[in-house]
Regions:
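Catalytic loop of short-chain dehydrogenase/reductase
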Residues: 1-15, 20-29, 41
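A glycine/serine/threonine-rich, flexible loop-to-helix segment
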Residues: 29, 41-64, 104-105
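Conserved SDR Rossmann-fold cofactor-binding beta-strand/turn motif
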Residues: 33-43, 83, 96-98
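Short, small/polar-rich loop/turn modules that mediate ligand/substrate recognition or access, typified
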Residues: 28, 33, 90-92
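Residues in well-ordered alpha-helical elements
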Residues: 17, 45, 54, 73-76
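A conserved structural motif in NAD(P)-dependent oxidoreductases
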Residues: 64-75, 86
Length: 105
């Protein structure tokens, strides 16, 4: 997916997802799990540099199947889950916390 005005962040995030898979394969035999978390649009300091970010937020609300944005607490809840025993069989995955926004491409 290409996001206008996002610059190099798109390719950087794609590299992060690929690195997650490779690290999971390399570190799995040592019992180390590696996953990536991809949140939906969040109002952060980094996001403030994206042109028309407010419009992006509104588009996310309109397009996401759950018709809402996520907040940082929901992202934190996923992090907590991944660190626990309930996720001990999950590795090499990118998990989305975005109200379904990513499925629409």
């Amino acid at each position: 997916e290409v996001i206008p005005g996002y610059g190099l962040m798109g390719p950087v995030k794609a590299a992060l997802e690929a690195s997650t898979r490779y690290l999971a394969a390399e570190l799995g035999p040592k019992g180390i799990r590696v996953n990536a978390i991809s949140p939906g649009p969040l109002a952060t300091r980094a996001a403030s540099g994206i042109p028309d970010f407010d419009a992006l937020l509104q588009e996310a609300v309109q397009r996401a199947p759950l018709r809402r944005l996520v907040d940082i607490d929901e992202v934190g809840a996923l992090c907590t889950f991944l660190a626990g025993d309930g996720a001990k069989a999950i590795t090499g995955s990118t998990l989305y916390v975005d109200a379904g926004y990513h499925i629409l491409g």
